[in-house]
């Protein structure tokens, strides 16, 4: 593990079925019918070379149209969240239920930085898929974590490293920026820890919805505000989070980029 603190701030005290996708922990299986002994041995030898699928992959089926009502204007805790121009959100990144094969239990969150997609596992080979923004070059991390805490309209406190890097921009928020529409954490923040340690990584909303589908953050997972509110409502705390590698493979351990 190489150490770098994430930069998302201090730790606080009717959907449709869509495309078929493969989860990172789903083992490929095959049925072998009775054949001659030599042929059977050959097939078994070949099967031994087949590796489990390690990253979600789309089939050739076309995506359904996501419900545009997900992105209408709404009021939450007194904050007026504006409607989004759905036609400008790539359909791949719109919230929708997809077929998703995974051995992970319902409630698990799987994030694929390569495809910029987050999956909330529903069970029965289905998941809710959301578009996300991920860490830019040099800030990508991977591994397993848990949901340690959740906050609506959270206060954002920039880490000392961020203030030192751009004091003119961030020093005014050294004491914390209250929750609101311009707060970088958006409408909700989901705080992650790994091995009991807080590295500063969050899944959170963002006023910069156009950054969804891009490598744009300092390591946190950005979501559209309407989407993070939906994901937040499904969590109870303690859920497993799996962040795949930058190439979309299952992580072999925790990787935190060096400062």
Segments from the language model and where they lie:
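N-terminal secretory signal peptides that target proteins for export/translocation
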Residues: 1-33
């Amino acid at each position: 593990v190489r150490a770098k603190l994430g930069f998302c701030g201090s730790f606080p005290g009717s959907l449709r079925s869509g495309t078929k996708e493969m989860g990172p922990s789903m083992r490929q299986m095959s049925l072998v019918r009775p054949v001659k002994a030599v042929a059977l041995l050959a097939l078994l030898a070949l099967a031994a070379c087949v590796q489990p699928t390690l990253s979600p992959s789309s089939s050739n089926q076309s995506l359904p149209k996501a419900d545009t009502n997900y992105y209408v204007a709404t009021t939450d805790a007194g904050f007026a969240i504006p409607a989004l121009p759905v036609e400008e959100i790539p359909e791949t990144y719109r919230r929708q239920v997809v077929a998703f094969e995974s051995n992970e239990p319902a409630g698990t969150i799987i994030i694929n930085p390569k495809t910029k997609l987050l999956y909330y596992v529903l069970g029965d080979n289905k998941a809710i898929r959301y578009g996300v923004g991920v860490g830019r070059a040099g800030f990508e991390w991977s591994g397993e974590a848990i949901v340690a805490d959740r906050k609506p309209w959270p206060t954002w406190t920039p880490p000392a490293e961020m203030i030192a890097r751009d004091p003119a921009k961030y020093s005014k928020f050294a004491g914390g920026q209250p929750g609101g529409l311009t707060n970088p954490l958006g409408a909700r923040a989901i705080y992650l820890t790994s091995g009991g340690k807080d590295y500063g990584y969050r899944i959170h909303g963002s006023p910069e919805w156009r950054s969804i589908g891009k490598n744009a953050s300092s390591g946190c997972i950005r979501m559209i505000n309407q989407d993070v509110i939906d994901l937040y409502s499904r969590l109870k705390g303690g859920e497993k989070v799996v962040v795949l590698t930058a190439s979309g493979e299952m992580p072999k351990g925790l990787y935190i980029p060096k400062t």
